[in-house]
């Protein structure tokens, strides 16, 4: 039994079905990726797993317990969320924002203790935002803000991290650093991660298993090598790609093809057929 169990999950926005009979499980310490084109239901799944939305059908259990039975405070000690965008308009410093992640662990009077500050400084160091500690959050770039929000989530010391395209605003250096950190925490601390990714190469490099979604359904589930095939990508994303093997990492590598190359390939197929 996985730490997270999703069984026949369904949800609709009015008459539009966003998630349909979705099932998967995620084990402790696993990095699990959710893939699919825009509108495939990925963000809705994360909202359901974080209880922002309530399922219309099916069941989600965490650590053997129905997700709906957790209090908000209990859930915040178990699961942290890093959304794609976070609006913080008040002039909080970076340290103050990160310390917000300690709220589920504070005593009845809500004052930070020395251990809370120690956790905050540690995760700020891990995410590379220590030097920004006294800066106000609204002064930061999009990429800097996103690393602060990740630090806030890690300050919760959750058992599971839900990530909605967490590196969308980051340059390639910081993308790799964030995923290196997430992978290390999963291996060393048993942190379970469910992440939405649009970059198929990052998914292949860092995820243990993937679920590929299409129109709210689970199209396929498995290792990156099993999921990221030409046939699957063509069927779900409706585009031509080149798939090879990265000699350095041993991982699947996906390259999109431009219009001229796609037209040439189609002409070659017609000539053969």
Residues of each region from the PLM?
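Catalytic Walker B motif of ABC-type/P-loop ATPase nucleotide-binding domains
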Residues: 161-165
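Conserved ABC ATPase "signature" region
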Residues: 99, 114-132, 157
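The feature captures the beta-strand-to-loop junction immediately N-terminal to the Walker
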Residues: 35-37
């Amino acid at each position: 039994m996985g730490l997270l169990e999703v069984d026949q999950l369904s949800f609709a926005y009015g008459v539009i079905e966003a998630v349909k009979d979705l099932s998967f499980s995620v084990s402790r310490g696993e990095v699990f990726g959710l893939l699919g084109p825009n509108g495939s239901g990925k963000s809705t799944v994360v909202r359901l797993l974080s209880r922002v939305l309530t399922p219309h059908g099916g069941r989600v259990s965490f650590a053997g317990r129905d997700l709906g039975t957790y209090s908000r405070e209990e859930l915040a000690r178990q699961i942290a969320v890093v959304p794609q965008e976070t609006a913080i308009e008040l002039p909080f410093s970076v340290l103050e924002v990160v310390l917000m992640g300690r709220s589920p662990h504070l005593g009845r009077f809500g004052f930070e203790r020395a251990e809370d500050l120690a956790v905050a400084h540690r995760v700020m160091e891990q995410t590379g935002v220590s030097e920004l500690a006294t800066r106000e959050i609204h002064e930061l770039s999009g990429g800097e803000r996103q690393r602060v929000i990740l630090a806030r989530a890690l300050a919760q010391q959750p058992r599971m991290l839900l990530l909605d395209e967490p590196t969308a605003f980051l340059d390639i250096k910081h993308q790799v650093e964030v995923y290196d950190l997430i992978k290390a925490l999963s291996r060393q601390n048993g942190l379970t991660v469910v992440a939405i990714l649009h970059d198929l190469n990052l998914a292949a490099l860092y995820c243990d298993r993937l679920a590929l979604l299409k129109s709210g359904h689970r199209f396929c589930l498995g290792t990156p090598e099993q999921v990221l095939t030409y046939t699957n990508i063509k069927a779900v994303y409706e585009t031509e790609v080149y798939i090879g093997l990265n000699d350095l990492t041993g991982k699947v590598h996906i390259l999109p093809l431009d219009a001229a190359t796609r037209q040439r390939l189609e002409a070659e197929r017609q000539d053969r057929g």
